[in-house]
Amino acid sequence: MATTPTPIFPQTPYLKTLSLAAVTACTTRAPTATASLAAANIIEITPVSTNGRRIDSVTVSACSTAITSATVAQVVGIWAWDGTTAYLIQEITVTAVTPSTTVAAFTTTWFPSIPLVLPAAFKLFASTTVTTPA
């Protein structure tokens, strides 16, 4: 971000979504080189930004084409990529829930204890530990 004597505030709010439907399970928690991200099923959430990004929260919500499709228990991994390697920085547990017209589908939000500030040229990625249906 540009040097300034005033506090840093987001210039433009940023909201990004990513579907993990029809995604193959990631089987590693190890730092992963750029060339191996696709093979490890680690998927980009946010593109690089010249000014960096402030991430206040990450929400994981079940989605399906059927309102009563059950959630599969799994872990969603959040990865920070520094331009050469992605590092697992957070794991979000997803519990099995069978929603209905009166029961809400699974949703949870991770709020970092302090906002996650990605430096310029960093990206955020995600993965899942279970192969998900379409």
PLM features per residue range, with description:
Residues 2-134:
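Surface-exposed, low-hydrophobicity beta-strand/loop segments enriched in small/polar/acidic residues
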